[in-house]
Amino acid sequence: VETGKVKFVFRDFPLDRLALAAAMMARCAPKERYFPVVDIIFGTQQNWAKVADPAAALSQIGLLAGISKETYQACVSNKEVFDGVMKIRNDGDKKYKVQSTPTFVVNEKRIDGHLPIERFRKVLDAELAKAKKK
């Protein structure tokens, strides 16, 4: 990515209502804070996803990211934000038949699951080698 040889595109693919709320919350952050919020969501997922009231815990995570409880509530109730996240999810499902997360798409080829970095690097290196030959 840093060399400009690879482009990374992150797309939300919520598999349940809680993941949907998290994706919606990130979308409601200011544009320049989107990826820092996503990092906080994923980095603290074990802390909020498996508690008795995960929605309240997610709201607390929002506070860490600078999203007030009022903004969080308005965001997760916003039909436009909901429709936007679901469109991205549904497009990924239709085009790539995504069934789980994480899923990566490299040159239109779907790669399912969490790969060790060495294996993922091999996939990327092979695709970069193909691109050089063109």
Map each language-model feature to its residues.
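Structural alpha/beta surface segment adjacent to cysteine/selenocysteine redox centers
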Residues: V1-L63
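C-terminal cap of thioredoxin/glutaredoxin-like
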Residues: Q60-K134
